[in-house]
């Protein structure tokens, strides 16, 4: 899996190329989390968002499909005793319905062949009235609306999923 291979260098590359965006994403997500929330982060990668939200959460369950990314996340998140790092598939989450106050899925939806499957699972595990946060980087010179069909899978998925 590509993510297992890039995991050891992921933070170095991202922090070199996009340090401000990377930090701003974590800060923005943290503002949307209520103090004391129980949060599921899907596709946590190396744990940057989980690290940003952990100080205000009662519990964070940081998940990723890639064991390589999880290895990096475990190192980064070891200082937070209330953060659990687990392997999980965003399209087939093994958590009970209504388990979390908030679910975060950063920078992943656009990478999935069937984003609707992930969105349905996210909706299923967030409690009624909970928060769903799906931040995605936008590169100003390469906007999806410049390529009309670029976001079709996501647009098709939204009405049925949420």
What are these regions (language model features)?
Residues 102-115:
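A short SAM/SAH-binding and catalytic strip from SAM-dependent methyltransferases
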Residues 116-128:
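A short glycine-rich, Lys/Arg-flanked "PGG" loop and its adjoining helix->strand segment in the class I
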């Amino acid at each position: 899996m590509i993510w297992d291979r890039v995991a050891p260098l992921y933070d170095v590359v991202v922090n070199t190329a996009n340090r401000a965006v990377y930090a701003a994403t974590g800060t923005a997500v943290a503002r949307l989390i209520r103090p004391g929330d129980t949060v599921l982060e899907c596709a946590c990668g190396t744990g940057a968002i989980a690290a940003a939200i952990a100080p205000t959460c009662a519990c964070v369950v940081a998940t990723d499909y890639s064991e390589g990314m999880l290895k990096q996340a475990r190192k980064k998140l070891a200082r937070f005793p209330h953060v659990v790092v687990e392997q999980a598939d965003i399209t087939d989450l093994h958590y009970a319905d209504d388990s979390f106050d908030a679910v975060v899925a950063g920078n992943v939806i656009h990478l999935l062949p069937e984003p609707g499957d992930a969105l349905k699972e996210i909706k299923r595990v967030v409690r009624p009235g909970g928060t769903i946060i799906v931040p995605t980087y936008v590169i100003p010179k390469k906007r999806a609306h410049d390529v009309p069909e670029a976001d079709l899978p996501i647009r098709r998925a939204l009405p049925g999923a949420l």
